[in-house]
């Protein structure tokens, strides 16, 4: 947790330094930026942190997942025992374990606290995977929790949101001044239109960065699953996903934390939260050699 906080602080300092450089190059008075920076920080981090704090409730509501309080059958008992054992190995609190209705093979983890997380699996996973394969998937999700990926993603999104808000308005003000010849600080309708376009453009690049980081996260979680369940089991689980994949039906709010995130070609690959299954399998096999 301390490492993530330090990284978060360093990244924010870098954003502020970059914003100061841009303002200096564009001739913007830094004293006029204090209000913008405060607004950007509030808006940039407000949404991502609120989403993080509410992530478990949102996930349960959007997927219809029900938490296993008392196991009703051997399958549910096995789920609880496996998650408990893996959580003890990595030194985190026992997550809530839930099942949600879904034909695809998938699972996800979420939560703002690594000691109070949620791990959920689809009914499709329980019906189509062997216990060895399911154990590896659970290990993958437990690795996400142990690595603090949900918190890291929220902090990254907050930093990028702040950057987009500040940069769009600084550059938008500069362009508006060039077009209108108005350097007195007053803003017309054109300024807000320019800012909107720039926010969409910079937001697109921010999404590409976020998804790139998410794909790196998945390789690390696969390694965690291999550690907790065994490398061969993790490879077999990913191969099973390749056979029985189909389009993910997870809601957008939790899709990035599923074991499977869909497929894409060309430029669409830049916006995928998960690497291709073939690359994930190859990475696991390469690490074994």
Swiss-Prot record:
It is a multi-pass membrane protein. The chain crosses the membrane at residues 5-25, 33-53, 155-175, 193-213. This is Protease HtpX. It comes from Xylella fastidiosa (strain Temecula1 / ATCC 700964). It comes from the Bacteria. Its cofactor is Zn(2+). InterPro entries: HtpX_protease, Pept_M48_protease_HtpX, Peptidase_M48. It is found in: Cell inner membrane. The active site is at 141. Its EC number is 3.4.24.-. Belongs to the peptidase M48B family. GO terms for cellular component: plasma membrane. One of its GO terms (molecular function) is zinc ion binding. GO terms for biological process: proteolysis. Zn(2+) binds at residues 140, 144, 218. Pfam families: Peptidase_M48.
């Amino acid at each position: 947790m301390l490492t993530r906080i330090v990284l978060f602080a360093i990244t924010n300092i870098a954003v502020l330094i970059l914003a100061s450089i841009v303002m200096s190059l564009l001739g913007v008075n830094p004293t006029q930026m204090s209000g913008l920076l405060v607004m950007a920080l509030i808006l940039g981090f407000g949404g991502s942190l609120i989403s993080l704090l509410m992530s478990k409730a949102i996930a349960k509501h959007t997927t219809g997942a029900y938490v296993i309080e008392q196991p009703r059958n051997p399958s549910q008992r096995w789920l609880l025992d496996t998650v408990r054992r893996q959580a003890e190995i990595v030194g985190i609190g026992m997550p809530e374990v839930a099942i949600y209705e879904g034909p695809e093979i998938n699972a996800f983890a979420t939560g703002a606290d690594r000691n109070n997380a949620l791990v959920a699996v689809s009914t499709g996973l329980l019906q189509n995977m062997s216990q060895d394969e399911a154990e590896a998937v659970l290990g993958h999700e437990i690795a996400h929790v142990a690595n603090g990926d949900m918190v890291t993603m929220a902090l990254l999104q907050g930093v990028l949101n702040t950057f987009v808000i500040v940069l769009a308005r600084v550059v938008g003000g500069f362009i508006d001044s060039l077009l209108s010849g108005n350097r007195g600080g007053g803003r017309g309708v054109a300024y807000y239109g320019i800012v909107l376009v720039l926010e969409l453009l910079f937001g697109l690049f921010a999404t590409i960065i976020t998804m790139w980081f998410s794909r790196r996260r998945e390789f690390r979680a696969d390694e965690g699953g291999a550690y907790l369940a065994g490398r061969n089991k993790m490879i077999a689980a990913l191969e099973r996903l390749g056979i029985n994949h189909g389009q993910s039906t997870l809601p957008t709010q939790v899709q990035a934390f599923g074991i499977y995130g869909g497929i894409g070609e060309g430029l669409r690959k830049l916006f995928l939260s998960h690497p291709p299954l073939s690359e994930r399998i190859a990475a696991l096999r390469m690490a074994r050699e």
